[in-house]
Curated annotation (Swiss-Prot):
Gene Ontology annotations of biological process type: translation
Domain of life from the UniProt record: Bacteria
Protein name, entry field: Small ribosomal subunit protein bS18
A Pfam family recorded for this sequence: Ribosomal_S18
Assembly and oligomerization: Part of the 30S ribosomal subunit. Forms a tight heterodimer with protein bS6.
GO molecular function, one term: small ribosomal subunit rRNA binding
One GO CC term, this protein: cytosolic small ribosomal subunit
Gene3D superfamilies documented for this protein: Ribosomal protein S18 (4.10.640.10)
Family, per entry: Belongs to the bacterial ribosomal protein bS18 family.
Organism encoding this protein: Aquifex aeolicus (strain VF5)
Keywords annotated in UniProt: Ribonucleoprotein, Ribosomal protein, RNA-binding, rRNA-binding
Length: 72
């Protein structure tokens, strides 16, 4: 029996050649849990570079009031 390695997810930002942006808060909501926490790389499928940049942009959107800090 041959066991194949699972296919790697391709980072959507690398694929589309763009960067995460705090002004696109509707898209950033996809990377938050129901409680408002930032999802990890395994769940988002992003590369390390874009995961770090995504976290910075989510925090920036929170400071501007575009995203909630905590969802109750």
């Amino acid at each position: 029996m041959v066991v194949r390695a699972p296919k790697k997810k391709v980072c959507m930002y690398c694929e589309q050649k763009r960067e995460p942006d705090y002004k696109n808060y509707e898209e950033l909501r996809n990377f938050l849990t129901e409680r408002g926490r930032i999802k990890d790389r395994k769940q988002t499928g992003l590369c390390a570079k874009h995961q770090r940049r995504l976290a910075v942009q989510i925090k920036r959107a929170r400071q501007l009031g575009l995203l909630p800090y905590v969802v109750y």
